[in-house]
Amino acid sequence: MAYPFQLGLQDATSPIMEELLHFHDHALMIVFLISSLVLYIISLMLTTKLTHTSTMDAQEVETVWTILPAIILILIALPSLRILYMMDEINNPSLTVKTMGHQWYWSYEYTDYEDLNFDSYMIPTQELKPGELRLLEVDNRVVLPMEMTIRMLISSEDVLHSWAVPSLGLKTDAIPGRLNQTTLMAMRPGLYYGQCSEICGSNHSFMPIVLEMVPLSYFETWSALMV
């Protein structure tokens, strides 16, 4: 859950988001070391009186500043590729939910059930109850079972949208005429908020996403009532 004046990322709720946080720290540490080295060299150049105006060739230095950046890029690229392949893997999902973007709301269809579908609109500010979040609450939450692999099929009925839930490490484009897919798994119950992350018109800011992750028994009860 995000909070006011937050500087860092949201707490991870899924294995993918945990991996993304670790990769973020890994890349940030490399950037910090590079920046420190550059600042150190600049400070030496500004304070030393030694000059090398007559140097015409320095193959050793050129070799170092060619090989070292290549090694650094490999250290960043390999973990990144690993996470990308992990995000693309969808093995034996327990549930499939189809999400369609509209101007300016989301519709959901539980494809494993015969007649379980609904639209999800933002609740206007004047209709919010005490404790509810402005611009983030919806009239119909997406209820899903926790600790289970869920496949999300995402598309759009009109313009480009993007279905994003930061704490789960999810951000998938909703493209008209194209069906994208992603997978999610929440490790603990709760409400997880997201928003459309692709500018899609005048009410782009009013397309929130709310996932309600519950134990499997609660989900089965809810789905039976909805059907």
UniProtKB/Swiss-Prot annotation:
It holds the Pfam family COX2. Cu cation A1 binds at H161, C196, C200, M207. The gene is MT-CO2. The keyword Magnesium applies. Component of the cytochrome c oxidase (complex IV, CIV), a multisubunit enzyme composed of 14 subunits. The complex is composed of a catalytic core of 3 subunits MT-CO1, MT-CO2 and MT-CO3, encoded in the mitochondrial DNA, and 11 supernumerary subunits COX4I, COX5A, COX5B, COX6A, COX6B, COX6C, COX7A, COX7B, COX7C, COX8 and NDUFA4, which are encoded in the nuclear genome. Keywords: Copper, Electron transport, Magnesium, Membrane, Metal-binding, Mitochondrion, Mitochondrion inner membrane, Phosphoprotein, Respiratory chain, Translocase, Transmembrane, Transmembrane helix, Transport. Belongs to the cytochrome c oxidase subunit 2 family. Mg(2+) binds at E198. Component of the cytochrome c oxidase, the last enzyme in the mitochondrial electron transport chain which drives oxidative phosphorylation. The respiratory chain contains 3 multisubunit complexes succinate dehydrogenase (complex II, CII), ubiquinol-cytochrome c oxidoreductase (cytochrome b-c1 complex, complex III, CIII) and cytochrome c oxidase (complex IV, CIV), that cooperate to transfer electrons derived from NADH and succinate to molecular oxygen, creating an electrochemical gradient over the inner membrane that drives transmembrane transport and the ATP synthase. One of its GO terms (molecular function) is copper ion binding. Binds a dinuclear copper A center per subunit. Residues 46-59 are mitochondrial matrix. Gene3D superfamilies: 1.10.287.90, Cupredoxins - blue copper proteins. It catalyses: 4 Fe(II)-[cytochrome c] + O2 + 8 H(+)(in) = 4 Fe(III)-[cytochrome c] + 2 H2O + 4 H(+)(out). GO terms for cellular component: mitochondrial inner membrane; respiratory chain complex IV. The lineage of its organism: Eukaryota, Metazoa, Chordata, Craniata, Vertebrata. The chain crosses the membrane at residues 15-45, 60-87. Residues 1-14, 88-227 are mitochondrial intermembrane. This is Cytochrome c oxidase subunit 2. SUPFAM superfamilies: Cupredoxins, Cytochrome c oxidase subunit II-like, transmembrane region. Cu cation A2 binds at C196, E198, C200, H204. The modification Phosphotyrosine is found at Y218.
